[in-house]
Structures are given as C-alpha cells and as structure tokens.
Amino acid sequence: MKIAIDAMGGDNAPEVVIAGVEKARDANKELTFLLYGDEAKIKPLIHHDERLTIIHTPEKINSDDEPVRAIRRKKQASMVLAAQAVKQGEADAMVSLGSTGALLAAGLFIIGRIRAIERPGLLPTLPTVDGKGFVMLDVGANAENRPYHLLQYAIMGSYYAKDVRNVENPRVGLLNNGTEANKGDKMHQEAHDLLAAAPGINFVGNVESSDILNGPADVVVTDGFTGNATLKAIEGTVRTVMHMLKGAIYEGGLSGKLGGLFLKGNLKSMASTFDISSYGGAVLLGLKAPLIKAHGAADAETVYYTLLQTAKMVQNGTVTKVADYFDAHPEVAEAKTAEKA
C-alpha cells in the first residue's frame, strides 16, 4: 500500500511530516510512502529509509497562493506531483498538511470525482462527551449545496463511519434549526425527505448544533457554509472553555490551586476527550481515491494518526464501496433530476 505525502505542506513541514511518517511506517509493515518535496530538507530528517522514497520537487504551494492558479501553474509543486501520483495509480492515497483550498483544487482537477458525485464534501471527525466522536460533512469544501448533495454526503459518511470508525449501522442526522421534520428552509426540508426515503441509510432525523457534541448521530450532514461555521464554533468554544478553566485555577489563589490539584485527573480526562488529534485529518469524500487534509499546525502524532486513518480507508476499499453504491442505486443518482423537476 503506497501513500503519497506532500512533505512540504503545513506550518512545521517537513519535520513533523517525516516524524509522523516514520512512526506510521514502523507501526504498519504494509505501508510504503512516496515523499514529495525538497530532498535537501527531507533526507537529513529520515532516521531509517526503509519503505520511504523521496521524489524531489523544486516547488511548493504556499498558504497565500491562490488555490486554483497555484495548482495549474506550479506543475512541479510537491502537492501537485503527489496528486498526480494518485491519479496515475502510483499511489493509493494522498495526505497533505498544506493549503486547504489548493488541496481541494488538486483533488477535483487532478485526482477527479467519482462519476455520480457532483460536489465532494470535507469530513472531519469531531468529539462527543462520551468519547466516541462523530463525523460531519460538508465543513467547507462548498459554499452552497443542494438537497441531493446532502443525500450523497449521508451515503459517503455512512460508509466512512463503518469502515474507518467501526460503527455498525451509523445513525445519520441532518443539521437543522430544530428536530421537527418540517423545520428549516426549503432546501433542508427537501433534504430531510430525500434522506428519509433513501435505501441503506439509518436516518434519525434533524439534529441541532446545540446537541451534536452529545452524540445524537454518528454522521451529521450539512451544507458547507453551515458546516464550516459550526466546526469553527466548536473549536473556538473548546479552546475558550479550557482557557477559562485554567485561568480560574491559577487566578483563584491557594483555594483555586488546591481545587485544581484535586481536579487534575478530571481536567486531563476532559482535555483528552476533546483533543481531536487522535482522530486524524479531514477527508475529501467523493474523489476517486482517498485524499486527507491534516491541520496545518498538526504535530507528528496527528500526522501519524492521519496516516493510520488513510491506511484504513485504503484497506477497506471505502471509495470503491461508495462508487458501487451509486452504481447499484440509480434512483439515488436520479434524486438530482427529481429535485429540479
């Protein structure tokens, strides 16, 4: 199994990328990595080169580059060549910590979409209070979506939850402004009806953003704009709460410090529950091969978990299962036509 790595993407590349790659290589004997980037920077970081191949690239895509233009003009960039390797069958999947916009463009224009999927969605795994977590898509690959896009997200998210997160019969919820079936605008009402009628989906109805961290669904589907806003609200709230707790302990004098000492184990457990690094990266679902985006500020441990996540997608043939579903259920693909009619 070969994974193409954009070794130059991210805030701390290539150091954390190579460290994460070597740890994943040592943990899984079936993994082989193609490292795309500046050989002079990558080679000194490698402790053992077994199952690692460096492909030197003279260019890289920067965070301030215009995404589509960068993909089209920087033909020798590490991200572009890694995506080309996947397209040409030289690698089974790709991982990058680089620019999200550029990576989405590389996925769409180089790797390509599954035939039935009109708009691939970005899927991260998020925490729940019971520690099990849930997946949500789309969280920003698209600014606007139609009802049938959300139906496709539900199908793809369900396969991902089964294959990668080991969830039997995953519950699918539609993010809405109320739990009643008639809630939301026309788009959400139509999406609700499509999800309720779709074969093979365990649809549990609408879910609210105020409740999703309690785990009412294993897969939460939403349009990209709402999903991105919800994701950022969750991340910001978690950071703020943890900061406030630390502040209350350190500023509370002796009693605060004593209380913090007694609560140390509980606070550590809480921090661990909401630490998403062990969940890996966000997957762009709907492409012809797995494409995973890890956070630009990710550390080596997050890179390691992202690579294990990627390997699981490849091993279980998640992309093939999604494509086969749409081939076997033309009525789902026809939801687009029915919606327009």
From Swiss-Prot:
Lineage: Bacteria, Bacillati, Bacillota, Bacilli, Lactobacillales
SUPFAM superfamilies in the record: Isocitrate/Isopropylmalate dehydrogenase-like
Keyword Acyltransferase: no
Species this protein is from: Lacticaseibacillus paracasei (strain ATCC 334 / BCRC 17002 / CCUG 31169 / CIP 107868 / KCTC 3260 / NRRL B-441)
One GO process term, biological-process aspect: fatty acid biosynthetic process
Domain of life assignment: Bacteria
Listed name of the protein: Phosphate acyltransferase
GN (gene name): plsX
Similarity comment text for this entry: Belongs to the PlsX family.
Keywords for this protein: Cytoplasm, Lipid biosynthesis, Lipid metabolism, Phospholipid biosynthesis, Phospholipid metabolism, Transferase
